[in-house]
Amino acid sequence: MRTPRAFTLVELLVVIGIIGLLIGILLPTLSRARAASNRTACAAQLRDIGHAFTMYMNDSRNKLPRVNTMPSMVPPPADNPPSAVQVLQPYIKGATNVWRCPADIIRKPSPGSPAGFDTYFDREGLSYQYNPMLSSSNAGMPLEKTDYYQRYHSLQLVVIFYDYEPFHGKAGKPGSTNYLFADSHVGDME
């Protein structure tokens, strides 16, 4: 009588090793794909914010909004202007998720948070920073009259919003931060 043929221990270990090797190759690729997906989602959301900003500018005779760039700041400024979310949300029909970048998972120490850490979105209500060069002294002015615009003379070079943190890579590296420009395109700083 012949015994049924079975896999030997060596054959099973070889198969397990090959599967482990394939997983080792695929996981970094999947991680890069997820990061690229998050960057694209953030860029699309910034583009939506850019369209809302353009609609606001059209309604306000091309004058820049007065916004508080850090609403969580304590104490608030004396006049305490509204946040960018409060100013632009009426122009973003029903979508509230545009204010949070899916890659905004960087946690910073925060004494007010029960856990001790929170994201920029948790503190400020958005993952993007309104360009401080356009707020305060330039608020209420037409964009083209600001010193910031006069430096570049092009809507394609004037940054309106940007990722608060380098969500998409190491700081200073190309592709680590999305920037929304005044012409509503989203890109990287060259």
Residue ranges and their predicted role:
Residues 40-190:
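Short, well-structured segments within or immediately adjacent to enzyme catalytic domains
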Residues 2-44:
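Amphipathic alpha-helical segments typified by the pilin-like N-terminal helix
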